[in-house]
Amino acid sequence: MITNPSNFRDLHDCYDFIEAGHLYRSALPRNLTKQDWDKLYNLGIRYIIDFRSEFERKEDSYECDQRFQHYNWSALKPETGIDDFYFPRLITKKSTKEEVYNSAWFIRKGYKIMPFDNLAYKQLFQLIKEKDGILFHCGSGKD
């Protein structure tokens, strides 16, 4: 059982039409030990895809084991094209009700448009054609 990174799962367990051992989802793989990376490698994973924004990656970075091909493909770009979705920065303890409401609206809208004409997803779908395993992640591995 993989416990680090958190929220790790084989998507075949959720969707049986996905080939087992080919597509995995998790939270960001930070603070992984060599043994953690070995477990991922032994599962056949060879690609790590980070769907977080550039800002998120700068705020919370990690070093990817060199055995893996690592891609940074931001999945959430609002209609403006600005790669700027970092929830902890959108809402703080000092946020007003209006700021919280506006941030929630931004997030809902972002998730409505995210699946359509998304370059990051197109790149993932191209990579799925490869036979090696793929682990993709955002910050928490929940969306």
Which residues does each PLM region occupy?
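Cys-dependent protein tyrosine phosphatase-like superfamily
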Residues: M1-L135
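Cytochrome P450 heme-iron axial ligand motif
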Residues: L135, S140-D143
